[in-house]
Amino acid sequence: HALGEELASQIKAHMNAHNARFQFIREPGSGGQDSGGHRVLIAESTPGHEALYATTIGSVSDLLSLDVSHPETIPGVTALDFPVALICTHGKRDVCCALKGRPVAALLSQHASGSTDGADAPETTSARVWETSHTGGHRFAPAMIVLPWGFTYGRAGAQAARQIWDLAVDGQVELDMLRGRSAFSKPGQAAEVAVRSRFHLTGLADVVAVENTTESVFRVVCADGNAHSVEVVQTVSDLPARPATCGKGDKEVKVFRATLL
Protein backbone atom coordinates (compact mmCIF):
# COMPACT_ATOMS: atom_id res chain seq x y z
CA HIS A 1 0.00 0.00 0.00
CA ALA A 2 1.29 3.50 -0.88
CA LEU A 3 0.88 4.68 2.73
CA GLY A 4 2.04 1.53 4.45
CA GLU A 5 -0.40 -0.96 5.93
CA GLU A 6 -0.48 0.53 9.43
CA LEU A 7 -1.13 4.14 8.40
CA ALA A 8 -3.59 3.06 5.73
CA SER A 9 -5.59 1.10 8.32
CA GLN A 10 -5.56 4.04 10.72
CA ILE A 11 -6.78 6.45 8.05
CA LYS A 12 -9.51 4.04 6.95
CA ALA A 13 -10.71 3.68 10.54
CA HIS A 14 -10.64 7.46 11.04
CA MET A 15 -12.69 8.04 7.89
CA ASN A 16 -15.16 5.30 8.78
CA ALA A 17 -15.68 6.92 12.18
CA HIS A 18 -16.70 10.12 10.39
CA ASN A 19 -18.78 8.31 7.72
CA ALA A 20 -16.30 9.55 5.14
CA ARG A 21 -14.36 8.06 2.25
CA PHE A 22 -10.68 8.71 1.51
CA GLN A 23 -9.33 9.27 -2.01
CA PHE A 24 -5.86 10.08 -3.30
CA ILE A 25 -5.85 13.06 -5.67
CA ARG A 26 -3.26 14.76 -7.85
CA GLU A 27 -3.35 17.51 -10.42
CA PRO A 28 -3.58 16.31 -14.03
CA GLY A 29 -0.20 15.76 -15.63
CA SER A 30 1.67 15.48 -12.34
CA GLY A 31 3.45 12.35 -11.23
CA GLY A 32 2.14 12.57 -7.71
CA GLN A 33 5.53 13.59 -6.32
CA ASP A 34 5.81 14.75 -2.72
CA SER A 35 6.34 18.52 -2.82
CA GLY A 36 6.66 18.89 0.93
CA GLY A 37 2.99 19.44 1.65
CA HIS A 38 -0.30 17.75 0.88
CA ARG A 39 -3.45 19.46 -0.31
CA VAL A 40 -6.64 18.13 1.21
CA LEU A 41 -10.18 18.58 -0.06
CA ILE A 42 -13.10 17.79 2.25
CA ALA A 43 -16.56 17.54 0.70
CA GLU A 44 -19.80 17.55 2.69
CA SER A 45 -22.25 15.84 0.35
CA THR A 46 -25.38 15.59 2.49
CA PRO A 47 -28.27 17.02 0.42
CA GLY A 48 -29.07 20.53 1.59
CA HIS A 49 -25.75 20.89 3.38
CA GLU A 50 -23.27 20.57 0.51
CA ALA A 51 -19.97 22.37 1.05
CA LEU A 52 -16.37 22.01 -0.07
CA TYR A 53 -13.26 22.90 1.90
CA ALA A 54 -9.52 22.90 1.23
CA THR A 55 -6.50 22.89 3.50
CA THR A 56 -2.86 21.82 3.53
CA ILE A 57 -1.16 19.33 5.83
CA GLY A 58 2.52 18.66 6.29
CA SER A 59 2.28 14.89 6.59
CA VAL A 60 -0.29 12.34 5.49
CA SER A 61 -0.52 11.19 9.11
CA ASP A 62 -1.95 14.63 9.94
CA LEU A 63 -5.20 13.39 8.41
CA LEU A 64 -5.77 11.50 11.64
CA SER A 65 -6.18 14.78 13.54
CA LEU A 66 -8.64 16.39 11.11
CA ASP A 67 -12.27 16.59 12.21
CA VAL A 68 -13.70 15.85 8.80
CA SER A 69 -17.24 15.83 10.24
CA HIS A 70 -16.84 19.55 11.00
CA PRO A 71 -14.33 20.78 8.39
CA GLU A 72 -15.31 24.41 8.90
CA THR A 73 -13.62 24.23 12.33
CA ILE A 74 -10.24 23.08 11.00
CA PRO A 75 -7.60 25.83 11.49
CA GLY A 76 -6.55 27.39 8.19
CA VAL A 77 -9.29 25.75 6.16
CA THR A 78 -10.72 27.58 3.13
CA ALA A 79 -14.32 27.25 1.95
CA LEU A 80 -14.47 26.86 -1.83
CA ASP A 81 -17.20 28.55 -3.86
CA PHE A 82 -16.77 26.49 -7.02
CA PRO A 83 -17.27 22.81 -7.90
CA VAL A 84 -14.42 20.33 -8.23
CA ALA A 85 -14.27 17.36 -10.59
CA LEU A 86 -12.48 14.10 -9.85
CA ILE A 87 -11.53 11.82 -12.75
CA CYS A 88 -10.59 8.23 -11.91
CA THR A 89 -7.15 7.41 -13.33
CA HIS A 90 -6.34 4.44 -11.09
CA GLY A 91 -4.55 2.17 -13.55
CA LYS A 92 -3.51 -0.39 -10.93
CA ARG A 93 -7.16 -1.29 -10.30
CA ASP A 94 -8.15 -1.12 -13.96
CA VAL A 95 -5.84 0.03 -16.73
CA CYS A 96 -8.89 1.38 -18.60
CA CYS A 97 -9.22 4.10 -15.96
CA ALA A 98 -5.69 5.35 -16.63
CA LEU A 99 -5.84 5.01 -20.40
CA LYS A 100 -9.21 6.73 -20.70
CA GLY A 101 -9.19 8.93 -17.62
CA ARG A 102 -5.88 10.77 -17.82
CA PRO A 103 -6.52 12.42 -21.22
CA VAL A 104 -9.99 13.47 -20.04
CA ALA A 105 -8.59 14.94 -16.83
CA ALA A 106 -5.97 16.93 -18.74
CA LEU A 107 -8.45 18.37 -21.23
CA LEU A 108 -11.09 19.09 -18.59
CA SER A 109 -8.52 20.84 -16.41
CA GLN A 110 -7.74 23.24 -19.24
CA HIS A 111 -11.44 23.81 -19.91
CA ALA A 112 -12.34 24.35 -16.25
CA SER A 113 -9.51 26.78 -15.60
CA GLY A 114 -10.71 28.84 -18.55
CA SER A 115 -14.28 28.93 -17.24
CA THR A 116 -13.40 30.68 -13.97
CA ASP A 117 -13.80 34.39 -13.36
CA GLY A 118 -10.05 34.94 -13.58
CA ALA A 119 -9.63 35.83 -9.92
CA ASP A 120 -6.45 34.68 -8.27
CA ALA A 121 -7.01 31.89 -5.78
CA PRO A 122 -4.72 30.58 -3.07
CA GLU A 123 -2.43 27.80 -4.27
CA THR A 124 -4.28 25.26 -2.15
CA THR A 125 -7.63 25.98 -3.77
CA SER A 126 -6.83 26.82 -7.40
CA ALA A 127 -7.32 23.42 -9.07
CA ARG A 128 -10.82 22.62 -10.29
CA VAL A 129 -10.00 19.19 -11.72
CA TRP A 130 -8.06 16.34 -10.11
CA GLU A 131 -7.07 12.81 -11.01
CA THR A 132 -8.15 10.40 -8.31
CA SER A 133 -7.71 6.84 -7.10
CA HIS A 134 -10.30 4.10 -7.63
CA THR A 135 -13.87 5.40 -7.43
CA GLY A 136 -15.75 2.22 -8.27
CA GLY A 137 -17.70 1.62 -11.46
CA HIS A 138 -14.55 1.10 -13.51
CA ARG A 139 -16.50 -0.68 -16.26
CA PHE A 140 -17.99 2.76 -16.96
CA ALA A 141 -14.58 4.41 -17.47
CA PRO A 142 -13.92 7.29 -17.75
CA ALA A 143 -15.59 7.82 -14.37
CA MET A 144 -16.17 11.34 -13.03
CA ILE A 145 -17.34 12.68 -9.65
CA VAL A 146 -18.52 16.25 -9.13
CA LEU A 147 -17.99 17.69 -5.65
CA PRO A 148 -19.34 18.72 -3.24
CA TRP A 149 -22.57 16.97 -4.30
CA GLY A 150 -20.94 13.60 -4.96
CA PHE A 151 -22.71 13.07 -8.28
CA THR A 152 -21.04 10.23 -10.21
CA TYR A 153 -20.98 9.92 -13.99
CA GLY A 154 -19.91 7.08 -16.25
CA ARG A 155 -18.39 6.97 -19.74
CA ALA A 156 -17.55 10.65 -19.40
CA GLY A 157 -15.33 11.19 -22.43
CA ALA A 158 -13.69 14.54 -23.09
CA GLN A 159 -16.73 16.22 -24.67
CA ALA A 160 -19.15 14.72 -22.13
CA ALA A 161 -16.93 15.75 -19.21
CA ARG A 162 -16.92 19.35 -20.44
CA GLN A 163 -20.71 19.28 -20.67
CA ILE A 164 -21.03 17.80 -17.17
CA TRP A 165 -18.69 20.47 -15.81
CA ASP A 166 -20.47 23.37 -17.50
CA LEU A 167 -23.84 22.15 -16.24
CA ALA A 168 -22.51 21.76 -12.68
CA VAL A 169 -21.20 25.33 -12.75
CA ASP A 170 -24.73 26.39 -13.77
CA GLY A 171 -26.32 24.32 -10.98
CA GLN A 172 -27.46 21.47 -13.21
CA VAL A 173 -27.07 17.70 -13.52
CA GLU A 174 -26.33 15.84 -16.77
CA LEU A 175 -28.93 13.06 -16.77
CA ASP A 176 -27.76 10.77 -19.59
CA MET A 177 -24.49 9.75 -17.91
CA LEU A 178 -25.57 10.12 -14.29
CA ARG A 179 -24.96 6.97 -12.21
CA GLY A 180 -25.87 8.23 -8.75
CA ARG A 181 -24.89 10.30 -5.74
CA SER A 182 -22.53 9.26 -2.97
CA ALA A 183 -24.85 10.40 -0.16
CA PHE A 184 -27.21 7.49 -0.85
CA SER A 185 -26.95 3.68 -0.93
CA LYS A 186 -26.48 2.01 -4.32
CA PRO A 187 -30.18 1.12 -4.73
CA GLY A 188 -31.09 4.55 -3.36
CA GLN A 189 -28.94 6.11 -6.07
CA ALA A 190 -30.81 4.09 -8.70
CA ALA A 191 -34.08 5.40 -7.26
CA GLU A 192 -32.94 9.02 -7.50
CA VAL A 193 -31.70 8.58 -11.07
CA ALA A 194 -35.03 7.00 -12.05
CA VAL A 195 -37.04 9.90 -10.63
CA ARG A 196 -34.74 12.53 -12.12
CA SER A 197 -34.94 10.86 -15.54
CA ARG A 198 -38.72 10.36 -15.43
CA PHE A 199 -39.51 13.95 -14.47
CA HIS A 200 -36.45 15.58 -16.05
CA LEU A 201 -35.19 17.01 -12.76
CA THR A 202 -31.87 18.55 -13.75
CA GLY A 203 -31.27 20.95 -10.86
CA LEU A 204 -28.51 19.94 -8.46
CA ALA A 205 -30.91 20.52 -5.56
CA ASP A 206 -34.07 19.08 -7.17
CA VAL A 207 -33.90 15.94 -4.99
CA VAL A 208 -33.55 16.57 -1.26
CA ALA A 209 -33.77 13.07 0.24
CA VAL A 210 -34.00 9.37 -0.55
CA GLU A 211 -35.61 7.32 2.22
CA ASN A 212 -35.68 3.52 2.49
CA THR A 213 -39.30 2.63 3.32
CA THR A 214 -39.01 -1.15 2.87
CA GLU A 215 -36.19 -3.46 1.85
CA SER A 216 -36.71 -2.69 -1.84
CA VAL A 217 -38.86 0.46 -1.92
CA PHE A 218 -37.47 3.98 -1.68
CA ARG A 219 -39.20 7.32 -1.22
CA VAL A 220 -37.55 10.04 -3.30
CA VAL A 221 -38.38 13.49 -1.92
CA CYS A 222 -38.13 16.42 -4.31
CA ALA A 223 -37.57 20.11 -3.68
CA ASP A 224 -40.97 20.94 -5.21
CA GLY A 225 -42.67 19.05 -2.38
CA ASN A 226 -43.52 15.93 -4.36
CA ALA A 227 -42.40 12.48 -3.24
CA HIS A 228 -42.19 9.35 -5.40
CA SER A 229 -42.05 5.69 -4.39
CA VAL A 230 -39.59 3.59 -6.36
CA GLU A 231 -39.02 -0.16 -6.20
CA VAL A 232 -35.41 -1.14 -6.84
CA VAL A 233 -34.24 -4.70 -7.41
CA GLN A 234 -30.83 -5.99 -8.42
CA THR A 235 -30.82 -8.42 -11.31
CA VAL A 236 -28.65 -9.72 -14.12
CA SER A 237 -28.73 -7.51 -17.20
CA ASP A 238 -30.26 -8.76 -20.44
CA LEU A 239 -27.13 -7.50 -22.19
CA PRO A 240 -24.45 -10.02 -23.22
CA ALA A 241 -21.65 -10.73 -20.75
CA ARG A 242 -18.75 -8.30 -21.08
CA PRO A 243 -15.32 -7.72 -19.54
CA ALA A 244 -15.57 -6.11 -16.09
CA THR A 245 -12.14 -4.53 -16.58
CA CYS A 246 -9.61 -4.12 -19.36
CA GLY A 247 -7.88 -7.38 -20.21
CA LYS A 248 -10.29 -9.53 -18.21
CA GLY A 249 -12.72 -12.19 -19.39
CA ASP A 250 -16.43 -11.68 -19.93
CA LYS A 251 -18.61 -11.42 -16.85
CA GLU A 252 -22.37 -11.20 -16.49
CA VAL A 253 -23.52 -7.68 -15.67
CA LYS A 254 -25.61 -7.03 -12.57
CA VAL A 255 -27.82 -3.94 -12.65
CA PHE A 256 -30.36 -2.19 -10.47
CA ARG A 257 -33.81 -1.95 -12.04
CA ALA A 258 -35.94 0.90 -10.74
CA THR A 259 -39.72 1.06 -11.17
CA LEU A 260 -41.83 4.04 -10.12
CA LEU A 261 -44.86 2.86 -8.18
Where are the regions a protein language model picked out?
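Histidine/cysteine-enriched polar flanking segments
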Residues: H1-L261
